[in-house]
Swiss-Prot record:
GO terms for molecular function: ATP binding; GMP synthase (glutamine-hydrolyzing) activity. Pathway: Purine metabolism; GMP biosynthesis; GMP from XMP (L-Gln route): step 1/1. Catalyzes the synthesis of GMP from XMP. Keywords: ATP-binding, Glutamine amidotransferase, GMP biosynthesis, Ligase, Nucleotide-binding, Purine biosynthesis. It is an enzyme of class 6 (ligase). It catalyses: XMP + L-glutamine + ATP + H2O = GMP + L-glutamate + AMP + diphosphate + 2 H(+). Its EC number is 6.3.5.2. This is GMP synthase [glutamine-hydrolyzing] subunit A. The keyword ATP-binding applies. Residues 5-189 form the Glutamine amidotransferase type-1 domain. Heterodimer composed of a glutamine amidotransferase subunit (A) and a GMP-binding subunit (B). It comes from Methanosarcina acetivorans (strain ATCC 35395 / DSM 2834 / JCM 12185 / C2A). The active site is at C79 (nucleophile), H166, E168.
């Protein structure tokens, strides 16, 4: 696979720099950008993909809703980024049954491009209080867990994916594989 340019959108999450490092360690050209970067500035960078980081609260998600609706490149939302994708397309987010920072087991419902080769179960690291409660219309439900029903999803026609867990942290098994699957989507787009 060629070296891709992947922009990491900073939503003020504690793991944003880990996303950047994970992408860089997988030999991709990457940089972190503020979540208030104008769309025209993002497009001027000619990125192959965007990753929306996690963050502490939706009120600080900047222009993420605009990015997922208006930028026509592959997008991966992680944690709050996943929730922002859902909200941008009419889904609902609410407080989860269990919040906090813990290892959980994910059940892959549908492998799709992003979860290819990762199932049927994956041990991942989660750190969140809120979760996607209702999928946006037409979105495909990809994974679930005992504490969060919508752990992963994708847009029905666009290469837009969301995962509630953190593939960038070392405790997540197969996190690099998930990111590599995303890069393959970017490379084909």
């Amino acid at each position: 696979m060629r070296e891709l340019k992947i922009l990491v959108v900073n939503n003020y999450g504690q793991f944003c720099h880990l996303i950047h490092r994970a992408v860089r360690d997988l030999d991709m050209d990457t940089k972190i950008i503020p979540n208030v970067t104008p769309i025209e500035d993002i497009l001027a960078e000619e990125p192959d993909g965007l990753i929306l980081s996690g963050g502490p609260e939706m009120e600080r998600a900047g222009l993420c809703f605009d990015y997922v609706r208006e930028i026509d490149i592959p997008i991966l939302g992680i944690c709050l980024g996943h929730q922002a994708i859902a909200l941008a397309y009419g889904g609902h987010v609410h407080s989860g049954k269990k919040g906090g920072y813990a290892e959980i087991e994910i059940e892959v419902i549908e492998e799709d491009d992003i979860l290819r080769g990762l199932g049927p179960k994956i041990t991942v690291w989660a750190s969140h209080a809120d979760e996607v409660a209702i999928l946006p219309e037409g979105f495909i439900h990809l994974a679930r867990s005992d504490i969060c029903e919508i752990e992963a999803m994708r847009h029905p026609t666009k290469p837009i994916y969301g995962v509630q867990w953190h593939p960038e942290v070392s405790h997540t098994k197969k996190g690099d594989e998930l990111l590599t699957n995303f890069f393959e989507v970017c490379d084909r787009y």
